[in-house]
Amino acid sequence: MQGKVHVAIGTATAAFLCVQYPNGFDLGGVNVIPYIALLTASAGSYAPDIDMQTTHSGKKHKTASKVINKIGGGHRGITHTLLFPVILYVLMIFSQNYLQAYSGLASLVISLLFGFELGWIMHIFADLFNGKGCPIFWPIMQGKVHIMDLPSSGIGAWLFAIVYVSILVLIIRGGLF
């Protein structure tokens, strides 16, 4: 899927949280502020494609892109597993414990990390709708998982994003669930 589509999906999800939880929500005793998470969701949406040198994040971080591509199994390798979101979650817990005395700072840091992680997870989610899939359960299970085979570029990818955002809007308006 194209980077812009990933960003649209990740950012729409973060915006959805802004509408659903305008005052924030509790995550392990720290208030996550969705409006702050929104700031890093788009970066997180781009991040998994650092394993491909021709992508936005791959071009910005060429050396890291080459190394990750080589040791991580190429495109849709290690960066398209749940390993990185789990590492980010552990980092959030560590940050929360370390910054416990500074509640405002803890909330800021956790919100920024949460947004980045949300974008990352939404990137992987969107790639599950491509025939190539993602090795989301690596290293526990080998093989790639995919839900269905939708186009990963062009109008098909944008239609997927539009349908996804429309579902979020329906949920917000109470027309779904």
Regions found by a protein language model. Give the residues of each.
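N-terminal membrane-targeting hydrophobic helices
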Residues: M1-F177
